[in-house]
Amino acid sequence: MFSKINTILDTIDAYVWGIPLIVLILSVGLFLTIRLKGVQFTNLGRAFKYIFKDETDGKHGEVSSFAALCTALSATIGTGNIVGVATAIVSGGPGALFWMWLAALVGTATKYAECLLAVKFRQVDEDGHVVGGPFNYIEHGMGPKWKWLAKIFAFFGIGVGLLGIGTFTQVNGISSAVNNFFDPNNAWTVSLFGRTYSWTVVISCLILTFCVALVLIGGIQRISKVAQVIVPFMAATYFLAGILIILFNITDVPAAILTIVQSAFGLKAAAGGALGAMVVAMQKGIARGIFSNEAGLGSAPIAAAAARTNEPVRQGLVSMTGTFIDTIIICSITGIAIVLTGAYDMGLEGVAVTTKAFQLGLPFPDGVASFILMFMPRILCITTILGWDYYSERCLEYLTNGKKKCIKAYRWVYILCVFIGPYMTVSAVWTIADIFNGLMAIPNLIALVALNGVVAKETKDYLDRIKKKEID
Protein backbone atom coordinates (compact mmCIF):
# COMPACT_ATOMS: atom_id res chain seq x y z
CA MET A 1 0.00 0.00 0.00
CA PHE A 2 2.71 2.45 1.04
CA SER A 3 4.71 1.68 -2.11
CA LYS A 4 1.67 2.47 -4.29
CA ILE A 5 1.10 5.76 -2.47
CA ASN A 6 4.76 6.68 -2.89
CA THR A 7 4.55 5.88 -6.62
CA ILE A 8 1.50 8.13 -7.03
CA LEU A 9 3.14 10.94 -5.07
CA ASP A 10 6.35 10.64 -7.10
CA THR A 11 4.35 10.90 -10.33
CA ILE A 12 2.54 14.05 -9.15
CA ASP A 13 5.83 15.51 -7.92
CA ALA A 14 7.45 14.92 -11.31
CA TYR A 15 4.68 16.89 -13.03
CA VAL A 16 4.59 19.74 -10.49
CA TRP A 17 8.37 20.10 -10.34
CA GLY A 18 8.93 19.56 -14.05
CA ILE A 19 10.97 21.83 -16.30
CA PRO A 20 8.18 24.49 -16.64
CA LEU A 21 8.09 25.33 -12.91
CA ILE A 22 11.89 25.28 -12.60
CA VAL A 23 12.15 27.67 -15.55
CA LEU A 24 9.38 29.85 -14.07
CA ILE A 25 11.10 30.20 -10.69
CA LEU A 26 14.51 30.99 -12.16
CA SER A 27 13.01 33.29 -14.81
CA VAL A 28 11.00 35.34 -12.31
CA GLY A 29 14.05 35.71 -10.06
CA LEU A 30 16.27 36.68 -12.99
CA PHE A 31 13.63 39.06 -14.38
CA LEU A 32 13.27 40.83 -11.02
CA THR A 33 17.05 40.95 -10.60
CA ILE A 34 17.36 42.78 -13.94
CA ARG A 35 14.22 44.90 -13.42
CA LEU A 36 15.45 46.06 -10.00
CA LYS A 37 19.04 46.50 -11.21
CA GLY A 38 20.48 43.87 -8.90
CA VAL A 39 19.02 45.38 -5.73
CA GLN A 40 19.96 42.24 -3.76
CA PHE A 41 23.65 42.80 -4.55
CA THR A 42 23.91 46.60 -4.46
CA ASN A 43 21.98 46.99 -1.20
CA LEU A 44 22.95 43.86 0.73
CA GLY A 45 25.09 45.84 3.18
CA ARG A 46 22.29 48.32 3.82
CA ALA A 47 19.87 45.44 4.32
CA PHE A 48 22.00 43.91 7.08
CA LYS A 49 22.33 47.33 8.71
CA TYR A 50 18.55 47.70 8.80
CA ILE A 51 18.14 44.38 10.62
CA PHE A 52 19.44 45.85 13.86
CA LYS A 53 18.24 49.42 13.36
CA ASP A 54 14.57 49.98 14.07
CA GLU A 55 12.69 52.58 12.09
CA THR A 56 12.12 55.45 14.53
CA ASP A 57 8.83 56.60 13.03
CA GLY A 58 7.42 53.21 12.12
CA LYS A 59 3.89 53.18 13.51
CA HIS A 60 2.09 50.45 11.61
CA GLY A 61 2.59 46.79 12.42
CA GLU A 62 2.80 44.45 15.38
CA VAL A 63 6.46 43.41 15.70
CA SER A 64 9.86 44.92 14.93
CA SER A 65 11.55 44.34 11.56
CA PHE A 66 14.09 42.13 13.34
CA ALA A 67 11.29 40.09 14.96
CA ALA A 68 9.52 39.75 11.60
CA LEU A 69 12.77 38.52 10.02
CA CYS A 70 13.35 36.06 12.88
CA THR A 71 9.79 34.78 12.50
CA ALA A 72 10.42 34.24 8.78
CA LEU A 73 13.80 32.63 9.49
CA SER A 74 12.21 30.46 12.16
CA ALA A 75 10.05 29.00 9.41
CA THR A 76 12.97 28.49 7.01
CA ILE A 77 15.98 27.50 9.13
CA GLY A 78 15.22 23.96 10.16
CA THR A 79 14.85 20.59 8.50
CA GLY A 80 15.44 22.12 5.06
CA ASN A 81 18.98 23.12 6.03
CA ILE A 82 19.89 19.90 7.79
CA VAL A 83 17.84 17.16 6.14
CA GLY A 84 16.65 18.86 2.94
CA VAL A 85 20.16 19.55 1.66
CA ALA A 86 21.16 15.97 2.38
CA THR A 87 18.08 14.64 0.58
CA ALA A 88 18.77 16.85 -2.44
CA ILE A 89 22.40 15.72 -2.72
CA VAL A 90 21.59 12.03 -2.22
CA SER A 91 18.82 12.05 -4.86
CA GLY A 92 20.22 14.68 -7.25
CA GLY A 93 23.96 14.37 -6.71
CA PRO A 94 26.39 17.02 -5.38
CA GLY A 95 25.37 19.31 -8.26
CA ALA A 96 22.03 19.91 -6.56
CA LEU A 97 23.87 22.28 -4.21
CA PHE A 98 25.00 24.43 -7.15
CA TRP A 99 21.40 24.86 -8.31
CA MET A 100 20.39 25.71 -4.75
CA TRP A 101 22.97 28.52 -4.83
CA LEU A 102 21.80 29.81 -8.19
CA ALA A 103 18.15 29.72 -7.16
CA ALA A 104 19.04 31.60 -3.96
CA LEU A 105 21.02 34.35 -5.72
CA VAL A 106 18.16 35.26 -8.04
CA GLY A 107 15.60 34.24 -5.42
CA THR A 108 16.84 36.98 -3.10
CA ALA A 109 15.31 39.51 -5.51
CA THR A 110 12.11 37.47 -5.45
CA LYS A 111 12.04 37.52 -1.64
CA TYR A 112 12.66 41.29 -1.68
CA ALA A 113 9.78 41.91 -4.08
CA GLU A 114 7.23 39.74 -2.31
CA CYS A 115 7.96 41.18 1.13
CA LEU A 116 7.86 44.74 -0.22
CA LEU A 117 4.43 44.06 -1.71
CA ALA A 118 3.23 42.47 1.54
CA VAL A 119 3.86 45.71 3.46
CA LYS A 120 2.56 47.87 0.60
CA PHE A 121 -0.82 46.11 0.41
CA ARG A 122 -1.32 44.93 4.00
CA GLN A 123 -4.65 45.47 5.75
CA VAL A 124 -5.91 45.88 9.32
CA ASP A 125 -8.53 43.33 10.41
CA GLU A 126 -11.55 43.96 12.62
CA ASP A 127 -9.51 43.22 15.75
CA GLY A 128 -6.89 45.80 14.82
CA HIS A 129 -4.27 43.24 13.79
CA VAL A 130 -2.12 43.91 10.75
CA VAL A 131 -2.44 41.13 8.17
CA GLY A 132 -0.95 40.70 4.74
CA GLY A 133 0.69 38.37 2.28
CA PRO A 134 0.30 37.23 -1.31
CA PHE A 135 -3.46 36.85 -0.93
CA ASN A 136 -3.63 40.56 -0.07
CA TYR A 137 -1.41 41.87 -2.84
CA ILE A 138 -3.06 39.58 -5.37
CA GLU A 139 -6.53 40.87 -4.48
CA HIS A 140 -5.72 44.52 -3.74
CA GLY A 141 -2.75 44.93 -6.07
CA MET A 142 -3.91 43.01 -9.12
CA GLY A 143 -7.58 43.78 -8.48
CA PRO A 144 -10.72 42.04 -7.11
CA LYS A 145 -11.16 40.03 -10.32
CA TRP A 146 -8.04 38.09 -9.32
CA LYS A 147 -9.42 37.09 -5.93
CA TRP A 148 -9.79 33.51 -7.18
CA LEU A 149 -6.01 33.35 -7.59
CA ALA A 150 -5.57 34.68 -4.05
CA LYS A 151 -7.84 31.92 -2.76
CA ILE A 152 -5.85 29.28 -4.62
CA PHE A 153 -2.68 30.57 -2.98
CA ALA A 154 -4.30 30.52 0.47
CA PHE A 155 -5.61 26.98 -0.06
CA PHE A 156 -2.20 25.60 -0.98
CA GLY A 157 -0.64 27.68 1.81
CA ILE A 158 -2.74 25.72 4.27
CA GLY A 159 -1.62 22.51 2.58
CA VAL A 160 2.06 23.44 2.92
CA GLY A 161 1.61 24.26 6.61
CA LEU A 162 -0.58 21.31 7.50
CA LEU A 163 0.93 18.55 5.36
CA GLY A 164 4.29 19.86 4.17
CA ILE A 165 6.96 22.15 5.58
CA GLY A 166 5.02 23.02 8.72
CA THR A 167 4.44 19.64 10.31
CA PHE A 168 5.32 16.29 8.74
CA THR A 169 8.83 17.06 7.49
CA GLN A 170 9.86 18.87 10.67
CA VAL A 171 8.57 16.32 13.15
CA ASN A 172 9.86 13.47 11.02
CA GLY A 173 13.31 15.06 11.04
CA ILE A 174 13.23 15.68 14.79
CA SER A 175 12.11 12.17 15.71
CA SER A 176 14.71 10.60 13.39
CA ALA A 177 17.50 12.68 14.93
CA VAL A 178 16.43 11.83 18.48
CA ASN A 179 16.05 8.15 17.64
CA ASN A 180 19.47 7.99 15.93
CA PHE A 181 21.05 9.38 19.09
CA PHE A 182 19.21 7.52 21.87
CA ASP A 183 18.13 4.27 20.21
CA PRO A 184 19.94 3.79 16.87
CA ASN A 185 19.35 0.02 16.90
CA ASN A 186 15.63 0.33 17.75
CA ALA A 187 16.03 -1.80 20.88
CA TRP A 188 12.88 -0.36 22.52
CA THR A 189 9.97 -0.61 20.14
CA VAL A 190 6.19 -0.39 20.08
CA SER A 191 3.66 -1.33 17.38
CA LEU A 192 1.49 1.52 16.09
CA PHE A 193 -0.64 1.83 12.94
CA GLY A 194 0.51 -1.61 11.82
CA ARG A 195 4.20 -0.66 11.94
CA THR A 196 6.97 -0.81 14.55
CA TYR A 197 8.47 2.36 16.02
CA SER A 198 11.06 3.11 18.66
CA TRP A 199 9.77 4.37 21.99
CA THR A 200 12.11 7.36 21.65
CA VAL A 201 10.13 8.44 18.57
CA VAL A 202 6.83 8.21 20.45
CA ILE A 203 8.08 9.99 23.58
CA SER A 204 9.87 12.79 21.68
CA CYS A 205 6.74 13.28 19.58
CA LEU A 206 4.55 13.67 22.69
CA ILE A 207 6.95 16.19 24.25
CA LEU A 208 7.22 18.17 21.01
CA THR A 209 3.45 18.26 20.53
CA PHE A 210 2.96 19.56 24.08
CA CYS A 211 5.59 22.31 23.65
CA VAL A 212 4.13 23.42 20.31
CA ALA A 213 0.61 23.55 21.75
CA LEU A 214 1.79 25.80 24.60
CA VAL A 215 3.39 28.37 22.30
CA LEU A 216 0.69 28.43 19.62
CA ILE A 217 -1.84 29.85 22.04
CA GLY A 218 0.13 33.13 22.13
CA GLY A 219 -0.06 34.01 18.42
CA ILE A 220 2.48 36.10 16.46
CA GLN A 221 3.83 37.99 19.49
CA ARG A 222 4.77 34.83 21.37
CA ILE A 223 6.06 33.11 18.24
CA SER A 224 8.26 36.11 17.38
CA LYS A 225 9.60 36.31 20.96
CA VAL A 226 10.58 32.64 20.89
CA ALA A 227 12.10 33.07 17.43
CA GLN A 228 14.17 36.13 18.43
CA VAL A 229 15.88 34.11 21.16
CA ILE A 230 16.26 30.71 19.51
CA VAL A 231 16.97 31.44 15.84
CA PRO A 232 20.11 33.65 16.12
CA PHE A 233 21.71 31.39 18.74
CA MET A 234 20.97 28.12 16.98
CA ALA A 235 21.95 29.45 13.55
CA ALA A 236 25.26 30.73 14.95
CA THR A 237 25.97 27.42 16.71
CA TYR A 238 25.26 25.36 13.59
CA PHE A 239 27.32 27.79 11.50
CA LEU A 240 30.28 27.40 13.88
CA ALA A 241 30.08 23.59 13.78
CA GLY A 242 29.97 23.63 9.98
CA ILE A 243 32.88 26.05 9.70
CA LEU A 244 34.94 23.76 11.94
CA ILE A 245 34.30 20.85 9.54
CA ILE A 246 35.47 22.96 6.60
CA LEU A 247 38.56 24.23 8.47
CA PHE A 248 39.56 20.76 9.66
CA ASN A 249 39.22 19.48 6.08
CA ILE A 250 40.32 22.62 4.23
CA THR A 251 42.55 20.73 1.80
CA ASP A 252 39.54 18.76 0.53
CA VAL A 253 37.33 21.82 -0.04
CA PRO A 254 38.58 22.70 -3.59
CA ALA A 255 37.92 19.13 -4.76
CA ALA A 256 34.46 19.23 -3.18
CA ILE A 257 33.61 22.51 -4.95
CA LEU A 258 34.84 21.06 -8.26
CA THR A 259 32.68 17.96 -7.73
CA ILE A 260 29.64 20.16 -7.05
CA VAL A 261 30.13 22.21 -10.25
CA GLN A 262 30.87 19.17 -12.44
CA SER A 263 27.87 17.30 -11.09
CA ALA A 264 25.61 20.33 -11.63
CA PHE A 265 26.10 20.04 -15.39
CA GLY A 266 26.19 16.24 -15.52
CA LEU A 267 29.90 16.23 -16.34
CA LYS A 268 30.49 13.20 -14.13
CA ALA A 269 27.78 11.15 -15.82
CA ALA A 270 28.23 9.03 -18.93
CA ALA A 271 27.89 11.01 -22.16
CA GLY A 272 24.34 9.82 -22.84
CA GLY A 273 23.18 10.54 -19.30
CA ALA A 274 24.74 13.99 -18.84
CA LEU A 275 21.57 15.92 -19.67
CA GLY A 276 19.42 13.66 -17.52
CA ALA A 277 21.81 14.00 -14.58
CA MET A 278 21.81 17.77 -14.99
CA VAL A 279 17.99 17.92 -15.03
CA VAL A 280 17.72 15.77 -11.90
CA ALA A 281 20.31 17.95 -10.11
CA MET A 282 18.38 21.08 -11.13
CA GLN A 283 15.05 19.63 -10.06
CA LYS A 284 16.19 18.41 -6.65
CA GLY A 285 18.42 21.42 -5.96
CA ILE A 286 15.84 24.06 -6.83
CA ALA A 287 12.97 22.17 -5.16
CA ARG A 288 14.93 21.72 -1.92
CA GLY A 289 16.26 25.27 -2.20
CA ILE A 290 12.73 26.64 -2.34
CA PHE A 291 11.82 24.35 0.56
CA SER A 292 14.70 25.77 2.58
CA ASN A 293 14.71 29.53 1.83
CA GLU A 294 11.08 29.81 0.63
CA ALA A 295 11.94 32.54 -1.91
CA GLY A 296 8.95 32.92 -4.21
CA LEU A 297 6.86 30.56 -2.13
CA GLY A 298 4.90 33.44 -0.61
CA SER A 299 5.35 32.53 3.05
CA ALA A 300 7.86 35.16 4.22
CA PRO A 301 5.59 38.06 3.09
CA ILE A 302 3.01 36.95 5.66
CA ALA A 303 5.55 37.55 8.45
CA ALA A 304 6.93 40.71 6.80
CA ALA A 305 3.46 42.26 6.72
CA ALA A 306 3.42 42.32 10.54
CA ALA A 307 6.62 44.42 10.78
CA ARG A 308 6.43 47.86 12.41
CA THR A 309 7.48 50.01 9.49
CA ASN A 310 6.13 52.67 7.17
CA GLU A 311 8.59 51.74 4.43
CA PRO A 312 7.80 48.72 2.21
CA VAL A 313 11.25 48.88 0.58
CA ARG A 314 13.03 48.87 3.91
CA GLN A 315 11.22 45.73 5.03
CA GLY A 316 11.85 44.14 1.64
CA LEU A 317 15.58 44.70 2.13
CA VAL A 318 15.50 43.27 5.66
CA SER A 319 13.50 40.23 4.58
CA MET A 320 15.71 39.40 1.60
CA THR A 321 18.65 38.77 3.95
CA GLY A 322 16.75 35.67 5.08
CA THR A 323 17.43 33.93 1.76
CA PHE A 324 21.11 34.86 1.93
CA ILE A 325 21.46 33.62 5.52
CA ASP A 326 19.46 30.46 4.93
CA THR A 327 20.93 29.18 1.67
CA ILE A 328 24.18 30.96 0.85
CA ILE A 329 25.47 30.52 4.40
CA ILE A 330 23.76 27.70 6.29
CA CYS A 331 22.77 25.34 3.44
CA SER A 332 26.22 25.80 1.89
CA ILE A 333 27.90 24.66 5.08
CA THR A 334 25.73 21.55 5.25
CA GLY A 335 26.18 20.75 1.56
CA ILE A 336 29.94 21.25 1.46
CA ALA A 337 30.34 19.14 4.62
CA ILE A 338 28.32 16.31 3.04
CA VAL A 339 30.23 16.42 -0.25
CA LEU A 340 33.76 16.72 1.11
CA THR A 341 33.22 13.83 3.55
CA GLY A 342 31.47 11.68 0.94
CA ALA A 343 28.56 11.05 3.31
CA TYR A 344 26.06 11.32 0.45
CA ASP A 345 27.40 8.16 -1.16
CA MET A 346 27.12 5.77 1.79
CA GLY A 347 23.58 4.46 1.34
CA LEU A 348 22.13 6.67 4.07
CA GLU A 349 19.11 8.98 3.94
CA GLY A 350 17.70 12.01 5.74
CA VAL A 351 19.35 13.32 8.88
CA ALA A 352 21.64 10.25 8.97
CA VAL A 353 23.56 11.70 5.99
CA THR A 354 24.26 15.01 7.72
CA THR A 355 25.05 13.25 10.99
CA LYS A 356 27.60 11.04 9.20
CA ALA A 357 29.17 14.12 7.58
CA PHE A 358 29.59 15.76 10.98
CA GLN A 359 31.00 12.56 12.48
CA LEU A 360 33.55 12.22 9.68
CA GLY A 361 34.38 15.92 9.48
CA LEU A 362 34.79 16.84 13.14
CA PRO A 363 37.75 15.53 15.16
CA PHE A 364 35.45 14.65 18.04
CA PRO A 365 33.91 11.36 19.21
CA ASP A 366 30.94 10.28 17.08
CA GLY A 367 28.64 10.88 20.04
CA VAL A 368 29.41 14.62 19.98
CA ALA A 369 28.42 14.99 16.34
CA SER A 370 25.33 12.86 16.90
CA PHE A 371 24.32 15.07 19.82
CA ILE A 372 24.76 18.24 17.75
CA LEU A 373 22.59 16.83 14.96
CA MET A 374 20.05 15.58 17.49
CA PHE A 375 19.83 18.82 19.46
CA MET A 376 20.00 21.34 16.59
CA PRO A 377 17.11 19.97 14.49
CA ARG A 378 14.99 19.57 17.60
CA ILE A 379 15.24 23.29 18.41
CA LEU A 380 15.28 24.73 14.88
CA CYS A 381 12.42 22.54 13.69
CA ILE A 382 10.24 23.65 16.59
CA THR A 383 10.54 27.26 15.43
CA THR A 384 9.73 26.18 11.87
CA ILE A 385 6.59 24.44 13.09
CA LEU A 386 5.55 27.58 14.98
CA GLY A 387 6.25 29.89 12.06
CA TRP A 388 4.25 27.79 9.63
CA ASP A 389 1.28 27.60 11.95
CA TYR A 390 1.15 31.40 11.81
CA TYR A 391 1.46 31.41 8.02
CA SER A 392 -1.22 28.79 7.43
CA GLU A 393 -3.57 30.37 9.97
CA ARG A 394 -3.37 33.66 8.06
CA CYS A 395 -4.23 31.76 4.87
CA LEU A 396 -7.23 30.16 6.55
CA GLU A 397 -8.24 33.52 7.99
CA TYR A 398 -8.32 34.93 4.46
CA LEU A 399 -10.40 32.04 3.11
CA THR A 400 -12.93 32.14 5.98
CA ASN A 401 -13.08 35.94 6.30
CA GLY A 402 -11.55 35.79 9.76
CA LYS A 403 -13.92 33.30 11.42
CA LYS A 404 -12.34 32.68 14.82
CA LYS A 405 -13.99 29.29 15.34
CA CYS A 406 -12.34 28.01 12.17
CA ILE A 407 -8.95 29.34 13.29
CA LYS A 408 -9.22 27.70 16.72
CA ALA A 409 -10.33 24.38 15.23
CA TYR A 410 -7.51 24.53 12.67
CA ARG A 411 -4.95 25.11 15.42
CA TRP A 412 -5.87 21.80 17.02
CA VAL A 413 -5.80 20.01 13.66
CA TYR A 414 -2.31 21.46 13.14
CA ILE A 415 -1.21 20.17 16.54
CA LEU A 416 -2.62 16.74 15.61
CA CYS A 417 -0.54 16.74 12.42
CA VAL A 418 2.53 17.51 14.53
CA PHE A 419 1.71 14.43 16.60
CA ILE A 420 1.34 12.03 13.64
CA GLY A 421 4.32 13.40 11.67
CA PRO A 422 6.90 10.80 12.83
CA TYR A 423 4.76 7.92 11.60
CA MET A 424 5.03 8.93 7.93
CA THR A 425 7.76 7.49 5.68
CA VAL A 426 10.65 9.85 4.94
CA SER A 427 10.28 9.75 1.16
CA ALA A 428 6.50 10.34 1.25
CA VAL A 429 6.89 13.26 3.65
CA TRP A 430 9.35 15.09 1.42
CA THR A 431 7.43 14.38 -1.77
CA ILE A 432 4.19 15.76 -0.27
CA ALA A 433 6.07 18.87 0.85
CA ASP A 434 7.55 19.38 -2.63
CA ILE A 435 4.13 19.08 -4.29
CA PHE A 436 2.44 21.65 -2.06
CA ASN A 437 5.44 23.99 -2.29
CA GLY A 438 5.24 24.05 -6.06
CA LEU A 439 1.48 24.55 -6.16
CA MET A 440 1.71 27.37 -3.60
CA ALA A 441 4.49 29.14 -5.47
CA ILE A 442 2.70 29.40 -8.84
CA PRO A 443 0.01 31.99 -7.87
CA ASN A 444 2.62 34.06 -6.02
CA LEU A 445 5.05 34.08 -8.95
CA ILE A 446 2.26 35.19 -11.28
CA ALA A 447 1.50 38.09 -8.92
CA LEU A 448 5.16 39.13 -8.68
CA VAL A 449 5.40 39.41 -12.46
CA ALA A 450 2.09 41.29 -12.68
CA LEU A 451 3.10 43.76 -9.95
CA ASN A 452 6.75 44.21 -10.94
CA GLY A 453 6.03 47.83 -11.91
CA VAL A 454 4.86 48.62 -8.38
CA VAL A 455 8.01 47.05 -6.93
CA ALA A 456 10.28 48.94 -9.34
CA LYS A 457 8.60 52.30 -8.63
CA GLU A 458 8.71 51.85 -4.84
CA THR A 459 12.37 50.82 -5.05
CA LYS A 460 13.38 53.76 -7.26
CA ASP A 461 11.55 56.29 -5.06
CA TYR A 462 13.15 54.92 -1.89
CA LEU A 463 16.69 54.83 -3.30
CA ASP A 464 16.25 58.35 -4.70
CA ARG A 465 15.35 59.53 -1.19
CA ILE A 466 18.52 57.90 0.11
CA LYS A 467 20.59 59.75 -2.51
CA LYS A 468 18.96 63.02 -1.44
CA LYS A 469 19.80 62.07 2.18
CA GLU A 470 16.16 62.32 3.19
CA ILE A 471 16.55 58.88 4.79
CA ASP A 472 19.52 56.63 5.52
Where are these regions (language model features)?
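N-terminal alpha-helical transmembrane segments of multi-pass membrane transport
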Residues: 1-79, 89-96, 107, 419, ...
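Transmembrane helix-loop junctions in multi-pass membrane proteins
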Residues: 4-5, 35-40, 80-85, 161-174, ...
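Membrane-interface loop-to-helix entry segments
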Residues: 24-31, 36-48, 171-178, 199-261, ...
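Helix-loop-helix module between adjacent transmembrane segments
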Residues: 32-33, 74, 103-128, 135, ...
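Extracellular/periplasmic helix-exit of transmembrane alpha-helices
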Residues: 33, 114-122, 126, 243-259, ...
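Flexible loop linkers connecting adjacent transmembrane helices
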Residues: 38-65, 87-89, 93-97, 101, ...
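Membrane-interface alpha-helices at helix entry/exit sites of multi-pass transporters
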Residues: 57-62, 93-102, 140-152, 186-194, ...
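Alpha-helical membrane segments and immediately flanking helix-loop junctions
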Residues: 58-91, 117-141, 152-155, 159, ...
